[in-house]
């Protein structure tokens, strides 16, 4: 999967197209990501110890990974991802537009 937790992404398709957000969680087996402030849904929750009031809660729902693109740290625009092996043998992701290494 080309995105990881903590990456900043832009949404390519759907009702939140064009919005930017940070990846909160990645689910590789389901090919989905949870993005901060994107795909908000209302859930009905029962009163519990954590939420004694209960009621309707707004939260993020996961979207398919193909509907997001990583944002290039240099230009701030959407970019594709490539992989390369550094001299020390570490495999890292890099932005195709700028060549900037994304993994530390």
Swiss-Prot record:
Disulfide bonds: none annotated. One of its GO terms (biological process) is translation. Gene3D superfamilies: 2.30.30.30. One of its GO terms (molecular function) is structural constituent of ribosome. CDD domains: KOW_RPL26. The keyword rRNA-binding applies. Coiled coil: none annotated. One of two assembly initiator proteins, it binds directly to the 5'-end of the 23S rRNA, where it nucleates assembly of the 50S subunit. One of the proteins that surrounds the polypeptide exit tunnel on the outside of the subunit. Belongs to the universal ribosomal protein uL24 family. HAMAP family: Ribosomal_uL24_B. This is Large ribosomal subunit protein uL24. It comes from Brevibacillus brevis (strain 47 / JCM 6285 / NBRC 100599). The lineage of its organism: Bacteria, Bacillati, Bacillota, Bacilli, Bacillales. The gene is rplX.
């Amino acid at each position: 999967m080309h995105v990881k937790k903590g990456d900043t992404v832009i949404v390519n398709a759907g009702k939140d197209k064009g919005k930017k957000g940070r990846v909160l969680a990645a689910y590789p087996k389901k090919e989905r990501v949870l993005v901060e402030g994107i795909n908000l849904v209302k859930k009905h929750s029962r009163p519990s110890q954590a939420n004694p009031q209960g009621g309707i809660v707004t939260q993020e729902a996961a979207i398919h990974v193909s509907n997001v693109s990583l944002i290039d740290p240099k230009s701030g625009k959407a970019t594709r991802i490539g992989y390369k092996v550094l001299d020390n043998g570490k495999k890292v992701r890099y932005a195709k537009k700028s060549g900037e290494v994304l993994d530390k």
